[in-house]
Amino acid sequence: MATLSLKPSQRYRLSDWLTNSYLLSTNAERQRDASHQIRQEARILRNETNNQTVWDEHDNRTRLAERIDTVNRWKEMLDKCLTDLDAEIDSLTQAKESVEQSLQAKNLPLDVAIECLTLRESRRDIDVVKDPVEEELMKEVEVIEATKKVLQEKISQAFQHLCLLQEIRQQLNSDHRDKMETLEIDRGCLSLNLTAPNLSLKVNPTRVPKDSTTLQEWDDFTRFNKNRADTEMKASIELRETIALAIAQTNNELEAQRVATEFTFRKRLREMESLYSELKWQEKNTLEEIAELQADIRRLEEDLRRKMMNLKLAHTRLESRTYRPNVELCRDQTQYGLIDEVHQLEATISIMKQKLAQTQDALDALFKHLARIQADIACKTNTMLLDTKCMDIRRKLTVPAEKFVPQVDTFTRTTNRTLSPLKTCQLELN
């Protein structure tokens, strides 16, 4: 017979069972509702975050593109500014070279003026005079020294401004390189997408790097460099204009002084030639007067000798008549006539000797004055030769060096050329 075997365990009541089933069903409904709510919220969050992420990425991509455009515009402005700056540096360098050449060209007129002054120191005696030519030559030296000082100052200004432009160029180049590097980085960032390789999380990417600047500071920095470059380029243009003006003015001043000096030279030469002609005329007349005076002296001496013979004749007659005998030794008319003749001859001879002495003195005076005239002629000849040599030397200022051939040869023999009247006169004096 079968027996009932029950497991010894707790028995739940039906109400507990029903309650449990109800609770399970209710909790399942509640959990599903909560899960549904969470799923809806997750979908909303996903949609919102996706939209936000897409918008943020699009917004930042747009900002990055705009930033690239901004940096690129500044880079292009820097490109143009650097091109203009390089052109201005070249122009200012050429202007500096021009003023250096102009300064170097002033050495020739200075050497010529000093050579003329030195050459004119060879004047002799009374011709060593501070005449208008010397004053103009000294003024020419002063003008050249003043122009050289002005040009040297312009060279210094150009050099200093070139250094400043080079410094600005280095700053612009540095800024330009930074912007090129920035463009490369930003364009690389713009080209990145979700499928790009090497995407990874970084350590603290939102940190603010050291020495970061604000957008205003960035804009002010580049704008300051560009404005400074524009200002200095404008100043460089003005400096080039002043350099060109200084070169033109100094050349005009030097040319005006050269014309004035050479005019004074020509005027002085005409004065010397006029005086030389006057001295030659005086020399000719003096020589003629000396010749006539010498002829008169010879005639006077001859007459004096004849008067002496007449006196000897009268003396001999008187002496001979003293030997008349006895009463024949009378003082007759012949005696008185011979005595009067002796007195007359003695007076005549005395007067003639005085006149002869005066004539000799006059001849000596003429010879002395002739010597002074001839010495002055020699001085004038020497001075004219020196001034003519100076005029020939000054041809270097208007004739190119490769075409310059001296026309006056003062110190060496002149060959295959007719001597000038000045040299002919010098040879006559020698």
From Swiss-Prot:
Gene Ontology CC terms, in alphabetical order: axonemal A tubule inner sheath; axonemal microtubule; microtubule cytoskeleton; microtubule organizing center; sperm flagellum
The places in or outside the cell where this protein is found are: Cytoplasm, Cytoskeleton, Cilium axoneme; Cytoplasm, Cytoskeleton, Flagellum axoneme; Cytoplasm, Cytoskeleton, Microtubule organizing center
Reproduce the UniProt comment on modification after translation. Tyrosine phosphorylated.
Primary place of residence? cytoplasm
An annotated GO BP: flagellated sperm motility
Source organism superkingdom: Eukaryota
Xref: Pfam families: Tektin
Coiled coil stretches, renumbered: 75-162, 226-380
- Alphabetically list the UniProt keywords: Cell projection, Cilium, Coiled coil, Cytoplasm, Cytoskeleton, Flagellum, Microtubule, Phosphoprotein, Ubl conjugation
Q: How does it assemble?
A: Microtubule inner protein component of sperm flagellar doublet microtubules. May interact with CCDC172.
Query: What is this protein's function?
Result: Microtubule inner protein (MIP) part of the dynein-decorated doublet microtubules (DMTs) in cilia and flagellar axoneme. Plays a key role in the assembly or attachment of the inner dynein arm to microtubules in sperm flagella and tracheal cilia. Forms filamentous polymers in the walls of ciliary and flagellar microtubules.
Q: Which family does it belong to?
A: Belongs to the tektin family.
| Protein name stated in the entry | Tektin-2
> Mind giving the lineage of the organism this protein is from?
Eukaryota, Metazoa, Chordata, Craniata, Vertebrata
